[in-house]
């Protein structure tokens, strides 16, 4: 068996085209366009690349994009004050603070300062809680994008044994909740998990998000499984690779996401979907 690649780039582009059409229709109807505030603290090169991609995507779709590039020495209070301003700005539907933040700033305090109806990253405890209670509104972008990729395969997720490798607040934990909502029997694995190989070998669906190149050997993948590789790691050679050993995994799996061009584009597409959703559902009556 040779796996079929799940083309995240093409699926994300289709979503962006639909969103652009909706924004155009809003303009023609005399409605305002969605607005996204993107806040970057410091000059982390990877963060600068991600933020640049998000800003360009906003402009391409006709969203308002507000950029705030703050020095790494910016105080926590100053950042919280800026978030307060964006919370009150009626032209802003979504607020994104690029993570990670400098060590002197407490991430949880920053995330909780963003109004839940403007939390387009889906990290606020309110929005994570809504997902846990099976009534999601603004969902975490990467898991949301992954669910779209899984749906694109046409495979019925109800009753599948799913394994999520990685338990971060950004991907692993909300991913497990999404899969539970989709009817999977879900196991979350982390650094203390025993017999990881045994768990992965039994999985019909594997999502890996640990940030370690080739962490999951391709031989572990069950024949016919769906493999979602969230990792994006740059080797010394400059090559980008995922957390799963792709070539061997692709021999066993039925569907697999490539790196790059799999999960990455979907994260930004989901962010844009969330921003339009916040505009339409929460703020059109403001």
UniProtKB/Swiss-Prot annotation:
Residues noted as binding NADP(+) in the record, renumbered to the chain: 166-168, 232
Any one biological process term the GO annotation gives: purine nucleotide biosynthetic process
Catalysis performed (reactions): (6R)-5,10-methylene-5,6,7,8-tetrahydrofolate + NADP(+) = (6R)-5,10-methenyltetrahydrofolate + NADPH; (6R)-5,10-methenyltetrahydrofolate + H2O = (6R)-10-formyltetrahydrofolate + H(+)
Source taxon at top rank: Bacteria
NCBIfam families in UniProt: PRK10792.1, PRK14186.1
HAMAP family referenced in this protein's UniProt entry, alphabetically: THF_DHG_CYH
Official protein name in the record: Bifunctional protein FolD
Organism: Shewanella piezotolerans (strain WP3 / JCM 13877)
């Amino acid at each position: 068996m040779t796996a079929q690649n799940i083309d995240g780039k093409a699926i994300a582009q289709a979503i962006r085209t639909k969103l652009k059409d909706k924004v155009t229709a809003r303009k023609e109807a005399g409605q305002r366009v969605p607005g996204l505030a993107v806040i970057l603290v410091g000059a982390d090169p990877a963060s600068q690349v991600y933020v640049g991609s998000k800003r360009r995507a906003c402009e391409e779709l006709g969203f308002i994009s507000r950029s705030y590039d703050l020095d790494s020495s910016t105080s926590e209070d100053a950042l919280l004050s800026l978030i307060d301003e964006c919370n009150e700005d009626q032209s802003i539907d979504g607020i994104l603070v690029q993570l990670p933040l400098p060590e002197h700033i407490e991430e949880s305090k920053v995330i909780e300062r963003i109004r839940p109806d403007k939390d387009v990253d889906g990290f606020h405890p309110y929005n994570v809680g809504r997902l846990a209670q099976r009534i999601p509104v603004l969902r975490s972008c990467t898991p949301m994008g992954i669910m779209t990729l899984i749906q694109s395969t046409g495979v019925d997720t109800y009753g599948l044994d799913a394994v999520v490798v990685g338990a971060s607040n950004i991907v692993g934990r909300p991913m497990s909740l999404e899969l539970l909502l989709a009817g999977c029997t879900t196991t979350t694995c982390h650094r203390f998990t025993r017999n990881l190989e045994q768990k992965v070998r039994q999985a019909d669906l594997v999502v890996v998000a640990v940030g370690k190149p080739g962490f999951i050997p391709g031989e572990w993948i069950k024949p016919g499984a769906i493999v979602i590789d969230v990792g994006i790691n740059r080797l010394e050679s400059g090559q980008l690779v995922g957390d799963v050993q792709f070539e061997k995994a692709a021999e066993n799996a039925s569907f697999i996401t490539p790196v790059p061009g799999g999960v990455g584009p979907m994260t930004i597409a989901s962010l844009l979907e969330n921003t339009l959703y916040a505009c339409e559902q929460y703020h059109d009556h403001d």
